[in-house]
Amino acid sequence: MLTAEEWVRQNIILFLHKDLKVPVSHIAVEKGFKVKGLSKRFDIVVFDKKGNIIILIECKSPKIKLNQKSIDQLVIYNLELNASYLMLSNGLKHIFIKYQNGNFEIIDDIPVYSKL
């Protein structure tokens, strides 16, 4: 049985593959990394053809409201991972963020994979 967060994660993977045309081989799920010496775990990342992380995604349960605390968590993770795009989703609402030159900007959507 899927947890609520896992249901969101599986649907985001489908969105990445079907809508954004991300090759499945360029998607990684739940891998550990360190932020300032602390062990953390991302939900989903997308790699470019050179193996660089270009999209960092944090999934929440549909019961969790997306708020500034959730965005801050994603931004802190990105200090280490340095993705160009961030996505936060609870399956009901999605927030897309572009990261460029040290600035974060909320955007309407993430471009298809071939445009990244």
Map each language-model feature to its residues.
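A short, conserved, highly charged catalytic patch centered on acidic carboxylates
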Residues: 1-85, 92-116
